[in-house]
From Swiss-Prot:
This is CDP-archaeol synthase. It comes from Thermococcus onnurineus (strain NA1). The gene is carS. One of its GO terms (biological process) is glycerophospholipid biosynthetic process. Keywords: Cell membrane, Lipid biosynthesis, Lipid metabolism, Magnesium, Membrane, Phospholipid biosynthesis, Phospholipid metabolism, Transferase, Transmembrane, Transmembrane helix. It is found in: Cell membrane. Its EC number is 2.7.7.67. Pathway: Membrane lipid metabolism; glycerophospholipid metabolism. Belongs to the CDP-archaeol synthase family. GO terms for molecular function: CDP-2,3-bis-(O-geranylgeranyl)-sn-glycerol synthase activity. Its cofactor is Mg(2+).
Amino acid sequence: MSLSSLLWAFWYILPAYFANASPVLVGGGRPIDGGRYWKDGRRVFGDGKTWRGLIGGVAIGTAVGALQYFITPEFYGSLGKALLLAFLLSFGALFGDLVGSFFKRRIDLPRGSPAIGLDQLGFLISALAFAYPVKTLDSGQIIFLLVVSPFVHWGANYFAYKMGWKSVPW
């Protein structure tokens, strides 16, 4: 696996990274679950998953993809494909995060509690799955992202914590 191939994998996943990080800045407002409870008596997702965070995160991730297209059009082939891929990566990332929150509520982890693995990789796996029909990575690139993403996630969260955007560093 060449360094170039690994860098392209990182370039590919940037919309998902930005989408996953954005809700802490643009979120708030009405919770996606509308305050509803699941059969187990716990919130479906909790107050931390909002429509503004979801829509804003997808919009920011998609905008990152558009910017990427103008920097490296050969990577995508067309603006339409770039926007579609960025949208799928962004929505997939936030869908994976939402699924993670659902499972965290089921095991009674409160909002903001860390779930090692789920927090760092759930968004990535979901983003890759959503984007699969449009553009895929090879197995080496996927393994690279599975290894590097937890460190990117932890670093981004620590940065957001130090900036005062998050109340916890995870």
